[in-house]
Amino acid sequence: MEVILLERIGRLGQMGDTVKVKDGYARNFLLPQGKALRANEANKKKFEGQRAQLEAQNLERKNEAQAVADKLNGESFIVVRSAGETGQLYGSVSTRDIAEIITANGFTLHRNQVELNHPIKTIGLHEVSVSLHPEVQVKVMVNIARSTEEAECQAKGEDLTSIEAIYGIEEQPLSEEVFDDEDEAEDQA
């Protein structure tokens, strides 16, 4: 099915482009969301008549998104979850969880705007892309930890999944520290 795009859509094209997409994608996503019109003569004339208005609305939305992006860019958000000793989460952190945390911190965000290839399943610092507008994207840090104290340690750069951090071992003892005497070391061997 051929459609006329009413806004920029990644991997498809810019506003005003006539592109061919699969019927299901057009019927189930593009047309109901108001992101495209069917490419027939009546809709082409309608689009050309409203093009200036649509471009102005798109520019306004882009400017609003850019203002939010300036505040949001580089921000760090803490997510507290249960995890095992090795740092594996009991469950995962998904786009919905990240959107809820960002919204709880005063930003308006929908989970579809969070771009995550797969759910996060380990503690640590994770960089996540947020698409506020098709042309405006920002990166935020999501600090996933077992507690807020642990999150502060991770923010300082400490690795909480290493053996030293898990068991409280600072360094391995040297053989001279274990055995008082070289003779004892030889007797033990």
UniProtKB/Swiss-Prot annotation:
Function: Binds to the 23S rRNA.
Single biological process term from Gene Ontology: translation
Protein name: Large ribosomal subunit protein bL9
Domain of life: Bacteria
PANTHER family in the record: 50S RIBOSOMAL PROTEIN L9
Keyword rRNA-binding in annotation: yes
Keywords linked to the UniProt accession: Ribonucleoprotein, Ribosomal protein, RNA-binding, rRNA-binding
Alphabetical list of Gene3D superfamilies matching this protein: Ribosomal protein L9, C-terminal domain, Ribosomal protein L9, N-terminal domain
Similarity comment text for this entry: Belongs to the bacterial ribosomal protein bL9 family.
One GO cellular component, as annotated: ribonucleoprotein complex
GO MF annotation: an example: structural constituent of ribosome
Claim: RNA-binding is one of the keywords in the record: yes
InterPro entries according to UniProt: Ribosomal_bL9, Ribosomal_bL9/RNase_H1_N, Ribosomal_bL9_bac/chp, Ribosomal_bL9_C, Ribosomal_bL9_C_sf, Ribosomal_bL9_N, Ribosomal_bL9_N_sf
